């Protein structure tokens, strides 16, 4: 992982308000934001060199003070950003220019060829400045390999648990609720969401 402002140089621990553990694809890379209450924003920008999807997707992450987000690259190029109990919001920006806000789990084949850039522009309360509907998210993910998780609740552990239980009518699964997106709509488990009628699934 390298600093966008200083290409080719690894970001040291504590750089730009984040502690970074670089890892090869398949291992987790963890970012810890500045301590809560210090009034600063953890705006560490990360990018990896362009690699095939099998070696991990390229992405960057902005996160708020007091929060943390984990990004892991698996052997199939999956990138996961997951918020904890603090109301941290991870934001990812695809090459197409649309912001994906919320808890996102993506396998973006169309992103593998280049870096994903994210602006450092979260409002003071940590909410997303630009909410996205499921249709907007779906249209931004490869319809062949795209997989994205979106929660309509504020990004908290309780909100995610409630959504998983509601969607699965039982205990929450080990991983976030899967949404399969293609160029016609979004599959939520076995349920279909029409891209033109998805207001109940907007991210916040």
Curated annotation (Swiss-Prot):
Activity is stimulated by zinc, potassium, lithium, cobalt, sodium, calcium, iron, manganase, magnesium and mercury ions at a concentration of 1 mM, but inhibited by copper ions at a concentration of 1 mM. Activity is inhibited by potassium, sodium and magnesium ions at a concentration of 1 M. Activity is inhibited by urea, EDTA, dithiothreitol, p-CMB, PSF, natrium lauryl sulfate and N-bromosuccinimide. It is found in: Secreted. It is an enzyme of class 4 (lyase). It comes from the Bacteria. Most active from pH 5.0 to 8.0. One of its GO terms (molecular function) is gellan lyase activity. Its main location: secreted. Keywords: Lyase, Secreted. Its EC number is 4.2.2.25. GO terms for cellular component: extracellular region. Multimer. This is Gellan lyase. The lineage of its organism: Bacteria, Bacillati, Bacillota, Bacilli, Bacillales.
